[in-house]
From Swiss-Prot:
Family from the record: Belongs to the NFX1 family.
Zn-finger segments (RING-type): 197-247
UniProt zinc finger (NF-X1-type) residues: 290-308, 348-367, 420-441, 485-503, 541-558, 595-614, 708-729, 738-760
Species whose genome carries this gene: Schizosaccharomyces pombe (strain 972 / ATCC 24843)
Domain R3H, first and last residues per copy: 835-897
Biased composition (Basic and acidic residues): 52-64, 100-116, 153-173
Gene: fap1
Protein name as catalogued: FKBP12-associated protein 1 homolog
Alphabetical keyword list: Cytoplasm, Golgi apparatus, Metal-binding, Nucleus, Phosphoprotein, Repeat, Transcription, Transcription regulation, Zinc, Zinc-finger
Length: 1077
């Protein structure tokens, strides 16, 4: 809170405040005048002045602090001295103190009324002694006045209680804290018990131990914050914890209850002070640049800005300004600068700083200086700070000595002669002395040969050089001088420089895999030895190989690969592996992104490419346009799912099937309507064909004459022009010599080649007919009448003689009829239709019996094939059991040691029975009920007495109205067992009955219907006719007597309905677990 030095600095009082104040002063008979004087008043005096100014205005502005406009808030008096935001020209702390002072004055006023009533009673007693007449009147007046004062007092107390808030919620509703600063708001909330702890969300009482965050100044219960600190440190395993309000890191773990300024521990609660305050001046420093302590009493929240006036100098210290300390602290980033030149002496000691007022050192001197070279012929400009060290050069010109400072070498050759006057200096520009240098070729300087190994006097055989111009002799030794590369010169002693090094070195190549021989001169010229080895290391992308010759990163890659982990850690290691710079792939990735429209522009990399960042700023509508995505739309986004129906027109012009809107790339559901269509061959018009089916076939043979003009097309119904292009059938013409048909490929337009022997099979026999043999015809142009003779053997004559003897004695000798009688009619009928399968089963079972194995498993097969295996195994004395559900149901055969093979093969028995049909066969009933009813057995694998009587199908849950029998028969026409029977169809209101008529030939009608029901149900559901097909019993009046329920072999009952999209094998997989064919 800022204090004013002059009463005139106080805020001006509004007119209504002055009037109310005068009335209050008259009623209390007190005069309140503000302190005057030029000196800075006491802080408490200034607060009292502000309180007096606001005191009377509370009645009009009380609605801002309390919902009741008739009474202000009664807050205990406290010394709140803060610099807060202004509220209608008054300070928030003044408003709080004014409320407390108003409370005190009301209490004093109530006490004064009580004292005056007592004085009136005493005066009434004294008047009774002096005048009896006046006693009654005076006493009555005093009594009435006392009663009136007491009544007034009680009314005022009741009004004050009614104006007092009932709870903290009502106080909070009546306060407008939005215009107060943080400190004032905290004081009001703490005094009125409105401040809540952010940990437990309970109110903070003035007498409760607290802790305040030094960053956000938020207040918490001390017990709550200690528990928060302990749990946070234990969970995070760190020394620091976070403030629950501002999340700032706190390192202090021993938390104590201190006052706001931190000077007093466990401050006592004083009624007239700010809660949790020690009552002493705060004394905190405000910022790094401020050295003045806070003058306010101990308070919550941040300290107000410093109002002290300080003097601040400019950067160069020549000028200064006076300003508030807080304002100076705020503008630390923009220091005060004057307009003067620094003028400080620079480090060179000669020049001064020419910069404008600045901070820090002046820096190096950049004053330009013109410097000469050592020889004095050239000069250039240097900054003063970078001027090199000078050297004194002296030169004698025409008897006078010229002297100057040389700072650098101009690199030009020196033109001065040595003292001999014959040789010139060969050095570049250098400092010059006044005297000439001694000649390096002088006889007193040069006493040895150039390599330094022999004396010149020795080489000249006792003679000496007389002058520096005499030739210098050389010796026969190797020079041996140390070259710049470190090797020695290998030439003979010579004059001048040694030249280049010719030493041959063996060093590793660039990839360090091989060694290469090079000269030292090549290495000095930058030659890099390489080999022809190709680097096969994978690059950083993991797709491409290096394929460089003699790669310099090969050895680094080997080291990197050796450090790779193995196992599961390798996958994560590859994501963060650092590659050598030689093996970083710089090719563009160029893979197609997930959007399908753009390509990856990153460098070739491991793992998947990032998602496409392209976006469209146009709306993306669905096909019908009623659902759309608004921009920006990421590239590759599919069109949105539309909940509305599809509006695409159909080419057939039938009504559209109800389905949701979809992209045009997806076709609409096929048209379910039935129409008439002409078949592909054009012979027939087929009815009840689905509209979506384009190619309709009648199933008849084409029978069009082929190009050979002899044979006819044997393809089934097909479009025109798709007949067999070239005839590859047998010729079929009668041969000339044998009358068999020609078996050569069709050769229309050419006669048959009679030179080729006929390959037609023939069966010839001996004269008695016992021996039969199959041969080929072999008739040809060269052998028109081939002879195929079979001679009789001795056995033939014996059998012929025995036959004649048996006939004479009337004895039957044919035992084959007994062997054929062992077989049943069902076995021989099945063999006539499926001879290959029956031969294979017979061969397997005969081998199984001969090998004396205990069991044999057949592969999965169809129902009628399993029935044949069961019947034939029973005939052989074997036991057979079916396992596994459809379509992998198979038969297991067991040999219990009672097997017996028939004398005649099934093939022979069938052939002999065809020749002698009068032979009686074994009845099917003798093979047991399982084989007798194998082709029409119950789907559960067992027959129950309750299943008898069922004689028809009933179709329920009809999907569409059907009034034509052909619609049902066209769907079930390709079921073989269904076509063997004659059916009658009866139409009801909500059902259709399918009743077989010729059921007398069926041994087990219920088993037959049970076997047919799943396939019939499936076909009718796929055709959209009925979703349920059940077995029922109908009487002579065509009324349904009972319906067979579906039984499932499991512990729990289940009612499964046929799903059209599933196969028959998954309709009821529990039923297939039972023993079945």
């Amino acid at each position: 809170m800022e204090t004013s030095k002059n009463p005139s600095d106080l805020p001006k009082k509004p007119a209504n405040v002055k009037k109310n104040r005068r009335r209050f002063q008259k009623s209390q008979k007190k005069s309140i005048s503000p302190s005057s004087g030029s000196e800075l008043p006491n802080f408490k005096t200034t607060i009292s002045q502000n309180n007096e100014e606001v005191k009377t205005s509370l009645k009009e502005d009380s609605s801002k602090f309390h919902p009741s406009a008739s009474a202000p808030i009664f807050v205990p008096t406290s010394s709140v001295q803060l610099n807060v935001s202004k509220n209608n020209g008054h300070k928030a702390s003044d408003i709080v103190d004014a409320v407390s002072s108003k409370d005190e004055e009301l209490r004093k006023h109530a006490k004064g009324e009580g004292k005056r009533s007592k004085n009136r009673k005493r005066s009434s007693k004294h008047s009774e002694k002096q005048a009896v007449d006046l006693k009654s009147s005076n006493s009555s007046q005093e009594t009435s006045s006392s009663k009136g004062s007491v009544n007034n007092k009680s009314e005022r107390s009741r009004e004050a209680k009614s104006r007092m808030p009932k709870n903290s919620k009502e106080i909070k509703k009546g306060l407008d804290l939005s215009k107060l600063d943080m400190t004032s708001r905290m004081i009001v909330e703490l005094k009125n018990r409105l401040y809540e702890c952010s940990v437990c969300t309970d109110t903070i009482n003035p007498s409760t131990s607290i802790w305040s965050c030094g960053t956000c100044y938020h207040v918490f219960h001390l017990s709550c914050i200690r528990k928060w600190c302990k749990n946070s440190i234990e969970q995070r395993n760190e020394d620091a914890w976070r403030c629950p309000y501002c999340q700032s890191n706190q390192t202090e773990t021993s938390l104590h209850y201190l006052c706001w300024c931190g000077k007093q521990e466990k401050p006592e609660f004083v009624k007239n002070l700010v809660p949790h305050s020690c009552g002493d001046p705060c004394g905190k420093t405000r910022g790094q640049d401020c050295e003045h302590p806070c003058p306010l009493l101990c308070h919550p929240g941040p300290c107000p800005p410093c109002t002290a006036t300080v003097e601040k100098f400019c950067l160069c210290g020549k000028e200064s300004i006076h300003a508030r300390c807080s304002n100076i602290s705020k503008v630390n980033t923009e220091p005060f600068r004057c307009e003067n030149v620094c003028d400080e002496l620079l480090p060179c000691g000669e020049h001064t700083c020419k910069k404008r007022c600045h901070s820090g050192l002046c820096g190096a001197c950049f004053e330009p200086i013109n410097a000469k070279c050592y020889c004095g012929l050239h000069s250039k400009t240097y900054p003063c700070s970078s001027l090199p060290s000078p050297s004194i050069s002296k030169k004698d010109e025409n008897g006078s000595v010229k002297e100057w400072f040389g700072y650098y070498s101009c690199n030009n050759p020196c033109t001065l002669f040595f003292d001999c006057g014959l040789h010139k200096c060969s050095k570049t520009c250098h400092p010059i002395s006044e005297t000439r240098a001694h000649c390096p070729f002088a006889t007193d300087v040069l006493t040895k040969c150039p390599c330094g190994k022999e004396d010149i006097s020795f080489l000249l055989k006792g003679h000496e050089r007389k002058s520096c111009s005499d030739p210098i002799p050389t010796c026969e030794n190797i020079c041996g001088k140390l070259l710049s590369c470190g090797h020695r010169c290998k030439y003979k002693c010579h004059l001048g420089s040694c030249g280049t090094c010719s030493e041959t070195l063996t060093i590793p190549c660039r990839c360090t895999a091989n060694e290469v021989q090079v000269t030292c001169e090549q290495l000095q010229n930058g030659f890099i030895p390489t080999c022809e080895r190709l680097c096969t290391i994978l690059l950083s992308c993991g797709r491409h190989q290096c394929n460089k010759k003699c790669c310099s990163g090969y050895s680094k890659a080997q080291t990197r690969l050796a450090r790779r982990p193995k196992g599961a850690k390798l996958r994560y290691h590859l994501l963060t592996e650092e590659f050598e710079e030689e093996h970083i792939c710089f090719r563009p990735c160029n893979k197609k992104l997930s959007c399908g429209n753009h390509f990856c522009q990153h460098m070739c990399h491991r793992g998947p490419c990032p998602r496409c960042l392209e976006a469209s700023f146009e709306e993306l509508p669905c096909t019908c346009g009623r659902t759309r995505l608004y921009p920006p739309v990421a590239c590759g986004t599919p069109i949105p799912d539309c909940p509305y129906l599809c509006v695409l027109p159909k080419s057939c012009h039938h009504p559209q099937v109800k389905h949701n809107c979809h992209p045009t790339s997806e076709p609409c559901p096929p048209c379910p309507y039935f129409v008439k269509k002409r078949c592909l061959c054009g012979k027939h018009i087929l009815e009840n064909q689905p509209c979506y089916r384009e190619n309709v076939r009648c199933g008849e043979l084409c029978n069009k004459l082929l190009s050979c003009k002899t044979h006819f097309c044997e393809k089934l119904c097909h479009p025109d022009g798709e007949c067999e292009s070239s005839c590859k059938k047998e010729c079929g013409k009668r041969r000339m010599y044998c009358e068999h048909v020609c078996q050569s490929p069709c050769h229309a337009g050419h006669p048959c080649d009679e030179r080729i022997p006929c390959k037609a099979p023939l069966e010839v026999s001996c004269e008695c007919g016992r021996i039969r043999k199959k041969v080929t015809c072999d008739a040809s142009y060269d052998n028109p009448d081939p002879q195929h003779k079979v001679s009789c053997t001795l056995e033939c004559s014996q059998q012929q003689r025995n036959k004649l003897f048996a006939e004479a004695l009337n004895i039957k000798t044919d035992r084959r009829s007994n062997d054929v009688a062992q077989y049943t009619k069902s076995l021989l009928v099945f063999y006539g239709k499926h001879s290959d399968f029956a031969d294979e089963v017979e061969s397997l079972l005969r081998n199984f019996v001969n090998n004396k194995a205990s069991s044999f498993r057949f592969p999965s097969m169809r129902r009628e094939q399993r029935a044949f295996v069961h019947m034939f195994a029973k005939l052989l004395g074997l036991e057979s059991v079916s396992f596994d559900p459809e379509p992998k149901r198979n038969v297991m055969v067991y040999n219990k040691g009672e097997a017996k093979l028939p004398n005649m093969l099934l093939k022979e028995a069938n052939l002999y029975h065809l020749q002698h049909p009068e032979i009686p066969l074994k009845p099917d009933s003798l093979l047991g009920p399982e084989e007798e009813n194998a082709t029409a057995s119950h789907i559960d694998g067992s027959s129950n007495a309750s299943d008898s009587g069922y004689n028809a199908f009933v179709l329920k849950e009809l999907l569409k109205e059907v009034n034509d029998e052909s619609a049902i028969f066209s769907v079930l026409d390709d079921i073989v067992d269904f076509n063997h029977l004659t059916w009658s169809i009866l139409f009801g209101e909500n059902y259709i009955i399918l009743k077989p008529l010729n059921t007398d030939l069926i041994v087990n009608k219920t088993g037959k219907l049970v076997a047919l029901r799943p396939l019939v149900n499936r076909r009718l559901a796929d055709a959209g006719i009925a979703s349920r097909c059940e077995i029922c019993e109908i009487n002579d009046k065509n009324e349904i007597v009972k319906t067979r329920s579906q039984r499932i072999h499991s512990k729990k009952k289940a009612f499964l309905s046929l799903v059209p999209d599933k196969s028959i094998g998954v309709i009821n997989r529990y039923k297939e677990l039972a023993t079945e064919l």
